[in-house]
Amino acid sequence: MLAMDQGVVEEWLSEFKTLEETAVYNYAVSLKEKGSLVPALYKVIRENYSDLLEPVCHQLFEFYRSGEPRLQRFTLQFLPELVWSYLSVTAARDPHCSGCIEALLLGIYNLEIVDKDGQSKVLSFTIPSLSKPSVYHEPSSIGSLALTEGALANHGLSRVVYSGPHLQRETFTAQNRFEVLTFLLLCYNASLSYMSGSSLQSLCQLSSRVSICGYPRQQVRRYKGISSRLMVTSEFLVQLITGIHFALCNGEVDLGSKALDDVLYRAQLELFPEALLVGNAIKSSLHGASLKSNKEGTRSIQVEITPTASRISRNAVTSLSIRGHRWKRHDAVDLGSPDELTEIAEVDEGICTQASGAQSSPPTIVISSSAGGAAAGAGKLAGKGLRRLTGRSSKEKDKEKDAATGMDQLTRKQAAVRAMSENLELLSLKRLTLTASQSVPKSGSLSLSRTASAVFSRSFEQVSNVFSGNQPSSRASSPTSNHVAEQDEGVAYLDHISPAHQHRQRSPTISIHVTSDL
């Protein structure tokens, strides 16, 4: 240390001792005019065996205890260098050199954790709501509440505590060391806009050294200081990243970029998710051109306070709008022309139109629910289908009359119809379509999954070329599927009376009628 720097420090030490209380404010303002004082104090702090280190630490503590904001900020600007000096001495296991620095750090910590009344200080913040005006976002159109002092005081939003209450510490231990240092960095970051360029550089150097010491990257950075690894916590790295972000946006691009990379390097090794999240978010938002152009001027972080375009939807989705919302049916059809009526009748009533072409549509399964018996449900289904068909041409009405005489013949072909329905079920697995006749069973009715499982649990081994004209083999029916067989009779009946529609190549349909009397 040069004699000139030593003289500047000694003069500074003697001035404050003889200062009256009324002249403290003027003295705090005049400290900015002493340009050689700050570099000289940095040299004293970096020399662990300097004779001036203990009186300097005592003077800095007196500055902070005075309560003058300017004097407190003057002490805080040396905090990164003080933290590094303490950690390096601790890693070297030489506690005799760090006694005064440790006392200064603990003194600042104990002063900051309490308020003016001596009560524990709790730091908290309020999460803004999109439904209410706020200084954090655009006012939404949900309400027209004026942003007044009374509205902010009675906003009704919960506050989230992010620091405190903290316990007083009399000495550093391995358990509370980084708890104290993290809180001190939090206080430092609260005054970042008042920090000098040398303080921001010291913060970046602290971040790099703490992160790389004892790791292979130390050789890349060519740092020849201590080579032992320093234990860190995720919260400590997050506070370092916060200060680095400010330094990046205020002229320290090179040092800040290296420090951010080093902290992310250490966070990856330690698997700290909080530090990785914050660091990668800041790294992704950086723009080199805008940072370099901000070398001189007002020190601030570049943020967009008032967006130029609206980014909040005016039609906000709330619980009320969700309850009042009704899903549109995917299969809604306008009942206009007779052809559309024919298509609805075939789909809703379970009409199975046999496809004779090679390019036939895949089969369709129609599921419906009813509270009546199985036979009554089949009769209602057939009757409803006939009523739908009466709205067609006169030829179709004649066909319906002729079809009435064929009901007796179909009863003798029940076994063949069951075999054909099994083949249709096998084909329906390729494409399962729930049509407009699907409905949810009411309470007391048979479970849809139970009835469907009874139908689909039958063996699919009997596969025959139904659409090629082959005659299916007869098979005895089980009691579980009697109502399905009766439903299939109605399907086969409508298929039998409508041979003119075979050229349309409609997809075959299976109608499963769910009843509650089983």
Curated annotation (Swiss-Prot):
Give the GO biological process terms.
myelination; phosphatidylinositol phosphate biosynthetic process; protein localization to plasma membrane
Question: Composition bias, kind Basic and acidic residues: at what positions?
Answer: 393-403
Disordered as annotated region, ranges? 385-410, 466-492
Any one annotated GO CC term: plasma membrane
UniProt-annotated location(s): Cytoplasm, Cytosol; Cell membrane
Cite the Pfam families for this sequence.
Hyccin
InterPro entries, sorted:
Hyccin
The keyword Cytoplasm appears for this protein: yes
Alphabetized, the UniProt keywords read: Cell membrane, Cytoplasm, Membrane
* Signal sequence annotation: none
Q: Which residues fall in a compositionally biased region of kind Polar residues?
A: 466-484
Say what the protein does: Component of a complex required to localize phosphatidylinositol 4-kinase (PI4K) to the plasma membrane. The complex acts as a regulator of phosphatidylinositol 4-phosphate (PtdIns(4)P) synthesis.
The entry sums up its family as follows: Belongs to the Hyccin family.
Tell me, how does this one assemble? Component of a phosphatidylinositol 4-kinase (PI4K) complex.
What is the protein named? Hyccin
Q: Which organism is it from?
A: Danio rerio
